[in-house]
A protein has these predicted regions:
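Core segments of cupin and vicinal oxygen chelate
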Residues: 2, 10-52, 59, 88-91
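Short, recurring structural edge motifs at helix starts
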Residues: 9-10, 66
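Conserved secondary-structure micro-motifs at functional edges
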Residues: 55-63, 71-73
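Mid-chain, well-packed structural core segment of small domains
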Residues: 68-93
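Short, contiguous strand/loop micro-motifs
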Residues: 5-6, 30, 76-77
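Short aromatic/hydrophobic contact patches that present stacked aromatics
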Residues: 7-9, 45, 78-80
Length: 93
C-alpha cells in the first residue's frame, strides 16, 4: 500500500542556480547534496512537510537527466512513493 509521497525529483540544468531559487520558493534550506556517480547526477534535497524535493543535475551531457532536459526542459522527472511492500505494489500496478 502506498503510504505517502517520499520525494519529488526535479531535473535542473544547474544546482548552483537552482538551489537558491528553490530555497526562496520553498522558504527552506537545502539540507543535503550528494553525487550519485552510478546515475551520473548531482542531487540536492529540501524537506517540505513530511516529504522532500530532490533536484537532479546531470554530470554528463549524455546522461539520463541531460537527455530529459534536452527533450522536455527542466521540470518534474519522477515522483517516489513510500510503500509497505514494493513487489506487491509493482504487481498491483
Amino acid at each position: 500500500m502506498m503510504q505517502k509521497i517520499e520525494h519529488i525529483g526535479i531535473a535542473v540544468k544547474s544546482l548552483a542556480t537552482s538551489i537558491p531559487l528553490y530555497e526562496s520558493l520553498l522558504q527552506t534550506s537545502c539540507y543535503k547534496t550528494e553525487t550519485v556517480a552510478s546515475e551520473f547526477v548531482n542531487t540536492a534535497f529540501f524537506k517540505v512537510g513530511d516529504s522532500k524535493i530532490e533536484l537532479l543535475e546531470s554530470t554528463t551531457p549524455d546522461g539520463v537527466i541531460a537527455k530529459f532536459i534536452e527533450k522536455k526542459g527542466e521540470g518534474i522527472h519522477h515522483i517516489a512513493y513510500e510503500v509497505d511492500d514494493i513487489y506487491q505494489e509493482m504487481n498491483r500496478l
